[in-house]
Structure formats: structure tokens, C-alpha cells
């Protein structure tokens, strides 16, 4: 009998301890941090606040096994799920009506700053997109400029080659013209010299015919005259 009484006492103590622990856990679960206004003033404090929701006696839902002493949680019923949904809706409504969303100078300034920063952040990608959209045009211009420069270089090379060819051909033509002029001048000189020689011979023959003496005799006579003069 003594052993059974001891076991019963330990079971009751364990049950009490478990109840205390669960109560402490439930208290922690039903508390949350929120911004709360102090009275009628605009002062707000961020502190722990109990969750405003309908109380459900979890102790009634818990079933203890007398043999094992363990706690068993039954499956949630439809009513409990409906209550949970209601509590979630209430939480959402309370968050909407909490002092966080209430209008005040400090919070309005903070919200304005946040909205300005978000607008700047939203505008910056648009600017980047615009710059990226505008940037291909210079790339196209740059790509067309080298093509135009290459065409110009090719045209310049072709013009230079044509000029060189024309200069070479003009040089050859001038050289051939100078050679032809030199040849013609040489021919003219030879012709004039031949004409002069022929005229000189003709004049000598005419003089000889006028004197009536052959040229050899005349040469002898000319040579004898200086001798006579010397005598």
C-alpha cells in the first residue's frame, strides 16, 4: 500500500509541475511587443503587451493518461480552427489600428523619408534602363565611324596609287618626249652641219672654177709666194 501511495503522490506532483510550466508558456505566447501610446498623449512606447484574444481553456482540452502520466493533445476541432481564424483577423485589425500606423509628426517624417528613399530607389533603375537604352546609339555611331574611316582610307590609298601611276606615266611621257626632242635636235644639227659642209665645198669649187687653176696648183702657188717674199 505504501508504494502505491508514493506513486500517486509523485504523479500528482508531476501533474502540478506540468500545469505550471504550461501556464508559463501560455503567458509567454500571449504577450507580444507593440508600440503603445501613453494615455491621451502622442508619446509612444515599444513594450510587451498582452495579446487581446478570447481565452481558450487549454486545460480542458488536455487529457491526461492516468497510467503513463503524459499529456495528450486532442485533434483540433472545427470550432477551434474558426476561433484561430478569428483571432488572426483580430490581430490584423489591431495591427492596423495600433499606434504604429497612427499619424504623428515623427512617424510622418520617418514615412516621408522612407517614401523618398523608395522613390529614389525606384527612379534609379529607370534611369539606368534609360541610359542603357540610349547607350546603343553611340555604340552604333562608333561602329559606323570606323567603317567610314576604313572606306576613307581605302579611297585615299586608291587615290594615292592613281596619282603615283599618273605621275609615273607622265614621267615616262616626258622622258620619251625629251628623248624625241633630243633626237630631233641631233638630227637637225647633223643636217645643218651637212648642209654647211656641202655649201662650203660648193663655194670652194665655185672659187676654183672662177680662178681657172686646179686646186693643187693653186696650193703650190700659194706656198711659193711666201718663199718669194722671203727672198
Curated annotation (Swiss-Prot):
Naturally occurring in which organism (per UniProt): Xenopus laevis
Biased composition regions of type Low complexity, renumbered to the chain: 174-185
Protein's UniProt name: B-cell CLL/lymphoma 7 protein family member A
Bias kind Basic and acidic residues: ranges: 186-199
Entries under Pfam families matching the protein: BCL_N (PF04714)
Family (UniProt): Belongs to the BCL7 family.
Biased composition (Basic residues): 72-86
InterPro entries with a match to the protein in the record: BCL7
Location of the region described as Disordered in the Swiss-Prot/TrEMBL record: 63-231
Superkingdom classification of source: Eukaryota
Biased composition (Polar residues): 95-105, 113-147, 158-173, 222-231
Underlying gene: bcl7a
